[in-house]
Amino acid sequence: MQIVDSQIHLWENARMSPQHRQIPTYSMDDALQEMAGAGVDAAVIHPPSTLGEAVNELAVNAVRQHPDKFCILGNFDLQSPDRLNIVKNWRQRPGMLGFRFTFNQPH
């Protein structure tokens, strides 16, 4: 049986919200090491929405290097003037399976 962690976050040089680990970076290599130690075969990356669009690219990079280990439910600014093109072309990005939004932000 394959074991998949359905929600992990990757970030780089960022301050995360209190619910997350309070470390400046949690990288693809950190995730792979912990996954191997826990017997997890693959993971779905959910880029933290509070960190903006650039964090999606961190996830895409992980998928490019380990397509057998990672896939992504990404996010974007719903107020973006380019939102229709973003949605239209979303799945062309490596590993993007769909979207995940949280609606608990003050905006």
Residue ranges and their predicted role:
Residues 53-107:
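Active-site gating/metal-coordination segments in enzymes
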Residues 1-54, 88:
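An N-terminally biased module of ancient metal coordination in phosphate/nucleic-acid-related enzymes
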